[in-house]
Amino acid sequence: AVAAVPPKRELRWTMLFHDLGKPLCRTFDEQGVGHFYGHTAISAQMAEDIMARLHFEKTLRDRIRAQLACFDDMFRPERAAIHKEMARLGTETVQNLLYTKQADNAAKVPAGLERAQAPWHEAQKIYDELISEGACCSIHELKISGEDLAALGYHGREIGAVLARLLDEVAAEK
């Protein structure tokens, strides 16, 4: 899975770290099928410890931490759902999440790979469309600013709250 992501440090480290906790969480159900409940949190903590010991620079640690935090997030391959995730996590984090999901699936589902990958390929296609259209994915990209809201009589934190609500509405494509 590590080799299946683009050669970016944070992606390669994320793929290496994301399943570290599985051996500590492995259980078997009645049919003898293995499960790894809670491995995400344990993997993230183990990654934190390793990154601290290896003295990773803060920006790299932050990027890896962000990827690990949303690694198990699932979103529907629908335009509004992906747009909302792009607004919530940032466009780069969503792109990296798509890379890591596709690589993770490729590593564990050899039979029926195309069917397992189909939702992620569709999500990637939608992501690419949103990027090429210049979709608004952050407060700074809104056509209205805090200054505009202040001119309309909004004050302080209320301005940030209104901008956040507007971004949510734009991302939901309402």
What do the predicted segments below correspond to?
Residues 1-116:
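Divalent metal-dependent catalytic cores for phosphoryl transfer on phosphate-bearing substrates
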